[in-house]
Design a protein with these regions (language model features):
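Local cysteine-cluster metal-coordination motifs and their immediate loop/turn environment
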Residues: 95-100, 236-255, 271-284, 315-331, ...
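Glycine-rich adenosyl-nucleotide cofactor-binding module
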Residues: 200-237, 460, 472, 479
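Ferredoxin-reductase
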Residues: 363-454, 511-513, 539-540
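A broadly conserved sequence feature marking short terminus-proximal activation segments
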Residues: 193-218, 246, 262, 268-294, ...
């Protein structure tokens, strides 16, 4: 690696030359009271390279706290806002741990579908790092291997008293130095040795010490998940304020909201930072909260950093900056203290912990995320119950949706927002597709108020659907509860349209009372077929309603059906509370784990595993699901 030497006076002139070039947006570390923050530089004298830690990490320039993804005009539809910054950025004074954090963010925003809003800014930037001179008392970057690095930057500065050593990490960095800096000299052997000494000194600066090798963190967490007392004790004082995730350089969760102007005819879709410690983070529109308590959210934060991302990407996503510790009002966010306590508690009960094997990871990418919805028209609207309506929708560009059974779309209503909705129609239905929508949140409530001919936006299809090919030749037992019939209908109708390819077909469907039954005409028509078995049930029947079917919860139907568990696949969808009871009954009938297929519901804001809302332990429902084989998730605590 090339190294150059420049005097501090010439380095200041280099910074001034960058600032004078109005084609560049020059960012640096500046004093802000008794703290430090990244901000635009107006002169080299503002630059502070002797800081301990900045309030926020430099990720804010690539993943801003507030960012417009899409604009809309009711007369024209949706349009993307260009993600490219008006000027290329030069960011001066980035500590090594924040550089490593950016590399982690790169992997996260690249996986599956890359985020163009993040990467356009990353690719148009130059990172000038600086080796740490002062270290925050909360910093433990040396323990995480992030205090001194030889990668990830364009230029890296080391303070050598009256001069800086500059490691050149990229061609962009070298070209920047050649163009704007003067009196740059090759480094001598003593300079190289001194830089090495400075980096070794950094490794001894930390006041925060682990009592064990940090490589044990993933396994420590694995052995501590079920220790509810440990998490309750450590989360007892948590305010659930989210300050720890707000300042974290590797937190990437976000929310998406629409913001209309006063005329309500124009607006924009905004992405804002979000945090898994906030109470409503995992709450869906119906009110179900899949992480309802502070201890479960507190635990999730640590598992996400130290276990889930390790399993998915091969790195512990904590760089040891210490910002979470320094910004926690009740002083409970120190990862070093928590992991030391965890280690000693496990040791006290005789648990042996060995380093986890680093998984072999190959990042799969499939192009860029398209946050811009396609315009579509409501061509038919059929009320089904007091709460559910069936919408038939046609894409305005004339294309088919080309979905798989079990997938979902993100539906946009201008000025209100976007919501994930399961596709109810079979892929064999061409020209249009159907969505059965329950009125529960702001988007679905507004959608119910729209009329035939009104416009909506559609993104998708998304997710992992049912494998209709794998099911060919098998007996199929569909078990649907309530609105769960909607996603199952896409596969059920596909099977009926290709009936000769499948074995026996049984549908068990339950709802609360007769008036809440969905697709009633279709279901009643099944009685005329001799190739489908259908059994309905209701939880209860009011005295003034006629009902000739079963009365009882959905599991009361399972004993009424004879089937061969070796040839039958059970396909299950319904409210969260239903799954464990249905699975227990299926297991009592000797149905193998891999013959049980489930469709799960979670909050989804992006559809491609970036926003973090749908995460259940290490799984992202929006891209790994929503359809799962039970054998793959039976050991995932948050799944069922």
């Amino acid at each position: 690696m090339k190294m150059r030497i420049i005097s501090k006076e010439d380095f200041a002139n280099f910074v001034e030359a960058l600032i004078k070039d109005k084609t560049l947006n020059v960012i640096g570390v500046k004093a802000k009271g008794d703290k430090f923050a990244f901000g635009p530089l107006e002169s080299a004298s503002e630059l502070r390279l002797d800081y301990d830690v900045t309030i926020l990490p430099p990720k804010k320039y690539f993943f801003p706290q507030r960012e417009t993804l899409v604009t809309y005009d009711l007369a024209k539809g949706f349009a993307a806002k260009s993600p490219i910054e008006a000027k290329p950025m030069v960011i001066i004074g980035v500590h090594p741990y924040d550089i490593v954090a950016l590399l982690h963010m790169d992997e996260i925003f690249r996986e599956t579908k890359s985020d163009p809003y993040y990467f356009e800014k990353r690719q148009a930037s130059i990172i000038i790092g600086v080796n740490i001179q002062k270290m925050s008392k909360w910093c433990f970057a040396p323990a995480m291997g992030c205090a001194a690095i030889d990668y990830g930057y364009d230029l890296m500065l080391t303070d050598l008293g009256n001069r800086y050593a500059i490691n050149i990490g990229s061609q962009k960095g070298e070209q920047l130095l050649d163009k704007y800096a003067k009196n740059v000299k090759p480094a001598l052997a003593r300079d190289i040795q001194l830089v090495g000494q400075k980096k070794r000194e950094v490794m001894e600066m930390s006041q925060q010490k682990f009592d064990f090798p940090p490589e044990l963190i993933p396994e420590l967490l694995s052995k501590s998940y079920e220790k509810s007392g440990f998490w309750e004790k450590h989360a007892e004082k948590c305010l659930a304020c989210g300050s720890c995730v707000l300042v974290c350089p590797t937190c990437y969760c976000f929310d998406v909201k629409d913001q209309a102007d006063l005329s309500l005819e124009y607006g924009e879709r905004i992405r804002t930072w979000d945090g898994c410690l906030l109470e409503d983070f995992a709450k869906i529109a119906s009110g179900e909260n899949f992480r309802p308590t502070r201890p479960t959210r507190y635990r999730h934060r640590y598992f996400k950093k130290g276990k889930y991302l390790f399993d998915r990407f091969g790195f512990i996503s904590c760089v040891g900056c210490g910002r979470c510790s320094s910004n926690c009002l009740p002083d409970i966010a120190n990862p070093v203290k928590l992991f030391n306590d965890m280690y000693h508690e496990l040791r006290s009960i005789g648990e042996q912990v060995a380093p986890a094997a680093v998984p072999e990871v190959e990042i799969q990418t499939e192009g860029n995320i398209d946050y811009v919805p396609k315009l579509a028209t409501i061509v038919k609207k059929v009320p089904m119950t007091a709460k559910e309506t069936l919408f038939e929708i046609k894409l305005d560009d004339g294309t088919d949706l080309n979905h798989k059974p079990g997938q979902f779309v993100e539906v946009s209503v201008f000025g209100v927002g976007e919501a994930p909705i399961s596709i109810s129609s079979s892929p064999t239905k061409k020209g249009t597709f159907e969505l059965c929508v329950r009125k529960v949140g702001s988007v679905t409530t507004r959608l119910h108020a729209l009329s035939v001919g009104d416009k909506v936006g559609i993104r998708g299809p998304f997710g992992n659907g049912f494998d209709a090919e794998q099911l060919k030749g098998k007996d199929l037992l569909f078990i649907a509860g309530g609105l769960g019939i909607a996603p199952l209908r896409s596969l059920f109708n596909y099977v009926l349209d290709n009936r000769k390819d499948y074995g026996r077909v049984i549908l068990l469907y339950g709802c609360k009372e007769p008036r809440e039954m969905l697709f009633g005409d279709e279901l009643r028509a099944l009685a005329k077929r001799n190739d489908v078995e259908f059994k309905p049930t209701v939880d209860w029947c009011p005295e003034n309603e006629l009902w000739e079917g079963n009365i009882g919860v959905i599991t009361t139907l399972i004993p009424q059906v004879n089937f061969d568990p070796e040839t039958t696949y059970a396909i299950v969808c319904g409210p969260p509370i239903m799954y464990k009871f249905v699975i227990a009954d299926l297991k009592s009938r000797k149905v193998p784990d891999d013959h049980i297929i489930l469709s799960l519901e979670r909050r989804m804001k992006c559809g491609v595993g970036k926003c973090g809302h749908c995460q259940i332990n290490q799984i992202y429902v929006c891209k790994d699901g929503p359809v799962f084989n039970y054998s793959k998730i039976k050991g995932v605590p948050e799944a069922l």
